[in-house]
């Protein structure tokens, strides 16, 4: 209803101003600004909905001010371009309509009415309401009843007798199992669900709506609210360090805790969370690549579900034979939005809906088959009688190609339990949420029936039953939950450990690189993650007087305040204010100590603007002084006009990437010398090794041959035509995820470049 009212007010404002208000620059600007805000808010809502499927929620608050640079980002480029073009067109059309009768005399009453209607349209819009609620949740002091409902369980289970297998199905919500809505989509896993304890009303709450948040909620009984963006958790050294979580209780009770997934464990700090709470044995893409049958069989995120679940079965078999008490947690990935992935071993590779193939539904049908196969192996084993199997979704599906069909249904998370010791077949319609999962499992294993804000759905009362407004209540508890991190409120001294790549201050430790906003009563960490913008772009959003400490590779800050370090990949520390003074310090010791040194200086807005503009220069446009192209730092020498076909800098250099261009092309500002030596330090990838690699300057072509290790080769060129462009053509680019950013599409690698130098020859 609010959507219709909001749009009606918007339309009325446009029509009244366009036809009755007349000519007045001030009223035109004010009305266009407010109407433009309405458009921006609704496009923000649409864009957020596209990424999350749940509007402007806590999970995407961070992306309102930072770039989304991870998780299959290439699949979102076209929608993003469409939004920008659409926004430009709408603003242009809006301005044209409002000025239709600009030659008529100004009418104060109609102008005021149009502006008030425009303000009303903004106030009534769902986007404004959602953002307002999020802003309130950031500034609340907490709720006095939090302590009454947050309960810490006993740290041990008195007499544990059962092993635990806990399967997180990526985005595998219970809605997919509605056979009337989606016939024969999940027959194998659906049949197993119907054989166990099936909890049919597991709702999703704020702070539980993405993978690491769902894991924290289900194991600790609290939403993931943090003093930083949740997916940036990889930068912290400990995770809710004071809380007792399911893994802690299991470890204290004699369990060996294992976790197996196909993606990189570092993503979103899953490794930090699990190590902080009782898990000593972790297996992700890096750990599995040396043990899986086919290390090259991977999708954008890591290993496919069939590979991961095969390894989980091997681990279950090994641990069961040993006779030790254990828990085995695993997380699938093939159903990840926006499209999902199809494992090659499943029979269900294609699912049609509305008369056409649907990739997301196909991925769900395939993944559930793989999960069911894993469970059936356990059920057929002699160890099933000593095992509890839990299957849950980590969160509801985000905006995938099945999302519009899911939204027509009553959506709930998946959570069911199969007990080998005591088979139970029942569907329990009790109202509950993800935070109740850990408490329910703990209850089944013989422990307490509460865990944080979670309650056992077998013997307790969920917060979802106690509070009809549980979503609002959860947001009200947000400050209380953030305080559980015990995060410091001041930063005076700090230490950098180069061996561990860590910074320590006031008892807290963070991985590098890191940006910190420091005020009198708060220290706000801004880590760099797959989902966040680079730190320099985040720093560009700081106010002129905001105090900052920025620890990063020297070359990243050198272009601003330390040009002599433009080619250094060492750690540097910059601190100050963007509108005031800044200092850059080179970290030159293994253990390096310093103090914050913020000066209360006069703010120079011209300096501030210059700093912000420089911080926002994209990597490929950065230029540095050097007599060669150094590939392990961003940018290029000043003599280079532009370049293409080259991937991002890595610690050793850069790969060519045929996804960005079939050729490596470096165009110089001026013609290359008439005679010169081209000194190339590089290596080849895969089948490009020992193959002739054409290198062209103008009409002249030389051949470069590289191995898999870095070597230096000198090629001799004549350049009678004054050509200004160097072209290198890798013969056989290889599609691979090696060294790739998690969630990005595979790169097509050819040669790895360390340095290219042009040396003029005499004569």
From Swiss-Prot:
Q: What is this enzyme's catalytic activity, as reactions?
A: a phosphatidylglycerol + a membrane-derived-oligosaccharide D-glucose = a 1,2-diacyl-sn-glycerol + a membrane-derived-oligosaccharide 6-(glycerophospho)-D-glucose
Show the GO MF annotations. phosphatidylglycerol-membrane-oligosaccharide glycerophosphotransferase activity
Where it sits in the cell: the answer is: Cell inner membrane
**Gene3D superfamilies to which the protein is assigned, alphabetical:** Alkaline Phosphatase, subunit A
Kindly state one GO CC term assigned in the UniProt record.
Answer: plasma membrane
Query: Which residue windows are transmembrane per the record?
Result: 4-19, 26-48, 76-98, 105-127
Q: Which UniProt keywords apply?
A: Cell inner membrane, Cell membrane, Membrane, Transferase, Transmembrane, Transmembrane helix
Chief localization class? membrane
Q: Biological process (GO) annotations?
A: glucan biosynthetic process
According to UniProt, this protein's pathway is: Glycan metabolism; osmoregulated periplasmic glucan (OPG) biosynthesis
Membrane topology, from the record? Multi-pass membrane protein
Enzyme Commission number:
2.7.8.20
Top class in the EC scheme: transferase
HAMAP family per the UniProt record, alphabetical: MdoB_OpgB
What does this gene product do?
Transfers a phosphoglycerol residue from phosphatidylglycerol to the membrane-bound nascent glucan backbones.
Family under the similarity heading: Belongs to the OpgB family.
Protein name, per record: Phosphoglycerol transferase I
Q: Which gene encodes it?
A: mdoB
